[in-house]
Swiss-Prot record:
Biological processes annotated in GO: photosynthetic electron transport in photosystem II; response to herbicide
InterPro entries cross-referenced by the UniProt entry: D1/D2 (IPR055266), Photo_II_D1/D2_sf (IPR036854), Photo_RC_L/M (IPR000484), Photo_RC_L/M_CS (IPR055265), PSII_D1 (IPR005867)
Protein name per its UniProtKB record: Photosystem II protein D1 1
Post-translational modification summary for this protein: Tyr-161 forms a radical intermediate that is referred to as redox-active TyrZ, YZ or Y-Z. C-terminally processed by CtpA; processing is essential to allow assembly of the oxygen-evolving complex and thus photosynthetic growth.
Organism: Trichormus variabilis (strain ATCC 29413 / PCC 7937)
Domain of life: Bacteria
């Protein structure tokens, strides 16, 4: 009898827990995906903050030249970053227990891998949580579909690119200047500016920003009610009012006259679908471009210059881009030392500037 009561009690407890996390009446929806999201997001956030502030230098290139990235090791908020896992680790999974000591784990950049993997699981769970809440409320699943664009972009630079290049050391650094460093180095190594998917991605991001600004300004400019001819149109709207007075016909008429008739939408659904689809598709293509370049399927390379009938080079944008790429790549090349650092940085030894005379 006691065993039966305990089983029923535990079953009721689990049932109550399931009802609570899936309830849409809570101030914040948790959901089953939230059970995975919360611990992984907290782990990634806590380790990132600790590493950003106090992580010791990391031997990112695997050549015994540690690179400091934290605030306590000489960086400011702009230059500080979480340095990627060492090239000596490659693509191996490197949890704390795989290292001989905590110092070794930190020296080889273990926190970077820990942050990235937990962060990716967290954003996948967040996307699943968006779908779960939409399902519970009877909504269509377009919100998680739109969120899949930044998820794909993060996956491309933090996971797909290191896999394609053979090491987590090639992943994007987790910091402001580290992000710019990743972008600048990516250009000469893969000629990203000449990749069509990158071009589509740029059009998606900047076009999405333009369309968002246009839409917001049009909506704000048509928040009016019908006024008489002796009243100003501005009297038809009170800031913070509860009722909606947006008039899509007015916005459509204004924009149609500003450009041409068919440049505007007279249907709210098609308008908002376009506003969502344009940047999402663009970012999908950008993520796909990064993923293809991860395996060295790079942008167009015009290695042979255009020559005139006398064999002289006709300089083009491709030549300028090639020279810039070569310059960036040379600056980024890893130093090859002939001596260990403790010998190379020791006291200067006197050397003979002339050969000694040889007695005959």
């Amino acid at each position: 009898m006691t065993t039966l009561l305990e089983q029923r009690s535990s079953a009721n407890l689990w049932h109550r827990f399931g009802n609570w996390i899936t309830s849409t009446e809570n101030r914040m929806y948790v959901g089953w995906f939230g059970v995975l999201l919360i611990p992984t997001a907290l782990t990634a956030a806590i380790v990132f903050i600790l590493a950003f502030i106090a992580a010791p230098p990391v031997d990112v290139d695997g050549i015994r030249e540690p690179v400091s990235g934290s605030l306590l090791y000489g960086n400011n908020i702009i230059t500080a970053t979480v340095v990627p896992t060492s090239a000596a680790i490659g693509l191996h999974l490197y949890p704390i227990w795989e290292a001989a000591s905590l110092d070794e784990w930190l020296y080889n950049g273990g926190p970077y891998q820990m942050i990235v993997l937990h962060f990716l699981i967290a954003i996948y769970a967040y996307m699943g949580r968006q779908w779960e809440l939409s399902y519970r409320l009877g909504m269509r699943p377009w919100i998680p579909v739109a969120f899949s664009a930044p998820v794909a972009a993060a996956t491309a630079v933090l996971l797909i690119y290191p896999i394609g290049q053979g090491s987590f050391s090639d992943g994007m650094m987790l910091g402001i200047s580290g992000t710019f460093n990743f972008m600048i180095v990516f250009s000469p190594e893969h000629n990203i500016l000449m990749h069509p998917f990158h071009m589509i991605g740029v059009a998606g991001v900047f076009g999405g920003a333009l369309f968002s600004a246009m839409h917001g300004s049009l909506v704000t400019s048509t928040l009016v009610r019908e006024t008489s001819e002796v009243e100003s149109a501005n009297t038809g709207y009170k800031f913070g009012q509860e009722e909606e007075t947006y008039n899509i016909v007015a916005a459509h008429g204004y924009f149609g006259r500003l450009i041409f008739q068919y440049a505007s939408f007279n249907n709210s659904r098609s308008l908002h679908f376009f506003l969502a689809a344009w940047p999402v598709i663009g970012i999908w293509f950008a993520a796909l471009g990064i993923s293809t370049m991860s395996f060295n399927l790079n942008g167009f390379n015009f290695n042979n210059s255009i020559l005139d009938h006398q064999g002289r080079t006709i300089d083009t944008w491709a030549d300028l881009l090639n020279r810039a790429n070569l310059g960036i790549e040379v600056m980024h090349e890893r130093n090859a030392h002939n001596f260990p650092l403790d010998l190379a940085s020791g006291e200067v030894q006197p050397i003979a500037l002339a050969a000694p005379a040889i007695a005959s």
